């Protein structure tokens, strides 16, 4: 196989195939070749067993990003050395979180990454977001504020384009809906106050929390951010709806408009 030619894996079944079964993928660039329908070499099997044991004993905290990424890749590539692909992904995107949150089109540019790997990465990303979201949905936000911030960071901190979310709350400040309002470019996202108010009325929401990310990693608000927030607040006041906060999610921290005196 040509060194830079990406292979495409066969779809992965729910349960890993038994040793010696069919369904192995074509060799990865830079990976050891294993004949289809054969057991992986002992050094690959031993390495995988050691990593799995370390994970079960010490958890993810005991593992660097490249080893945690290898564990994810094992399911999609059951009979080949996945270390080269894990290294290429981290070299391209920087860390484990940014690999998971990278757009599918950019992931597909990485040599050796086909549909099965892409699917596995996106399943892990979706699972992480679903877990974080479950800790805040249908709960009072004021008593689960840290969990809310964790969810916002999980869902938005590593995105490469701006996205704008609206969290809709009922009269008891219970989170009743979390909806993405818009996606934009690397430094701009279009937001329409009228659409936010229309949706708030449909949900019988009494309050809102606005959330958007800054792909640059710096959560400092721009004048456009401040102006947009003021327009939403003005529209909400007319409808008798409170805007509790506007959070800007950066790479490693967030900024609260209310805490900064901007709201």
Curated annotation (Swiss-Prot):
The keyword Ligase does not apply. Residues 141-263 form the MPN domain. CDD domains: MPN_DUF2466. Disulfide bonds: none annotated. It comes from Paracoccus denitrificans (strain Pd 1222). Gene3D superfamilies: 5' to 3' exonuclease, C-terminal subdomain (1.10.150.20), Cytidine Deaminase, domain 2 (3.40.140.10). The keyword Oxidoreductase does not apply. This is UPF0758 protein Pden_2304. It holds the Pfam family UPF0758_N. Belongs to the UPF0758 family. It comes from the Bacteria. GO terms for biological process: proteolysis. A motif (JAMM motif) lies at residues 212-225. PROSITE patterns: MPN, UPF0758. GO terms for molecular function: metal ion binding; metallopeptidase activity. Zn(2+) binds at residues 212, 214, 225. Keywords: Hydrolase, Metal-binding, Metalloprotease, Protease, Zinc.
């Amino acid at each position: 196989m040509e060194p830079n030619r990406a292979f495409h894996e066969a779809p992965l079944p729910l349960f890993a195939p038994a040793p010696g079964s069919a369904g192995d993928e074509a060799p990865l660039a830079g990976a050891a070749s294993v004949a289809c329908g054969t057991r992986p070499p002992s050094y690959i099997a031993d390495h995988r067993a050691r990593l799995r044991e370390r994970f079960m004993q010490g958890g993810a905290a005991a593992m660097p990003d490249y080893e945690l990424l290898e564990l994810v890749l094992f399911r999609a590539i059951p009979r080949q050395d996945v270390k080269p692909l894990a290294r290429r992904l981290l070299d391209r995107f920087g860390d484990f979180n940014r690999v998971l949150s990278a757009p599918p089109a950019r992931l597909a540019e990485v040599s050796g990454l086909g549909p099965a790997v892409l699917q596995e990465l996106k399943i892990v990303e979706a699972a992480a977001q679903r877990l974080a979201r479950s800790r805040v949905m249908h709960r009072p936000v004021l008593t689960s504020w840290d969990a809310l911030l964790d969810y916002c960071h999980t869902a938005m901190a590593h995105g490469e384009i701006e996205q704008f979310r609206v969290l809709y709350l009922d009269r008891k400040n219970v989170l009743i809906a979390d909806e993405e309002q818009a996606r934009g470019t690397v430094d701009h996202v279009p937001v329409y106050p009228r659409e936010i108010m229309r949706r708030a009325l449909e949900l019988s929401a009494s309050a809102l929390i606005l959330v958007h990310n800054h792909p640059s990693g710096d959560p400092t608000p721009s004048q456009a951010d401040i102006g947009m927030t003021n327009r939403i607040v003005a529209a909400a006041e007319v409808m008798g709806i409170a805007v509790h906060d506007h959070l800007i999610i950066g790479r490693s921290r967030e900024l609260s408009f209310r805490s900064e005196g901007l709201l």
